[in-house]
């Protein structure tokens, strides 16, 4: 939606880079060799563990004359708003929706097809569980989330999808359907394996130790599926590499548990970081703290 707005107002197609919070500083460093006129950071929350590096990269970009707009809905980003202001970074923040809500309300009217892009942004809101929709919208949101999460969906596919939205104004195509089917098959296989790795299940929630399983980017979806099936808080702990252990948490609608408030302090105590939202959060700690992380998470589920 934001790219479409820029294309109409500036006549340009911005370059798209995809980054997770814990590697945002590396992505920003890539821009320093050939600084653009404007950088828009969208839906990337602040990871407290790498915030000093992100802050330095932002400062370096601003010093080179780059204007920066940060659009987000994660509380960790709002908490550094004064720092961002001092750096000269503009923050567009919402606590009542998500980044897609801002895209729908602010940027969709600036495109050459406000109706299409408002609908596209609504799909993002549905995917982030801050809005509901009719059967068509729910289907489209489900297929897009599945396709984007397929094991073979790399940055190239994601960039192609964005270009399709901007140039063809189509929500999905045959490739989306194929990748969505791939995702469902991969998720079913991993779920069967994961259910053998539940190390704790109590009245409030369950804890999975999947450090010896390659999850291929499916951890959040596995936690979401378990939370929905069991009606409990679901925390999946896994190792994306030899250096780190990650815990991703999903909270069902009727559970009283703030995922980011509970998990972030644990990670900080163990020399890590992370963030997220009240019902969906992820933190990472050094691999040497994996056992301690499991212990602390189990304690959090039994309080």
Task: Report residues per predicted region.
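Short acidic, S/G/P-rich loop/turn micro-motifs used as interaction or catalytic elements
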Residues: 22-24, 45-50, 213-215
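A structured phosphate/pyrophosphate-recognition subdomain
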Residues: 3, 7, 37, 69-70, ...
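Short, basic, glycine/proline-bearing loop/turn elements
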Residues: 12, 38-45, 202-212
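Glycine-rich, acidic loop segments that terminate in or are immediately followed by a histidine
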Residues: 135, 206-303
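A structural-propensity feature for long, helix-poor, extended segments
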Residues: 28-48
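Anionic-ligand anchoring segments at beta-strand to alpha-helix junctions in alpha/beta enzyme folds, i.e.
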Residues: 1-35
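Hydrophobic anchor at the start of a short beta-strand
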Residues: 13-15, 67-68, 233-234
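Active-site cofactor/cluster-binding pocket
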Residues: 44-85
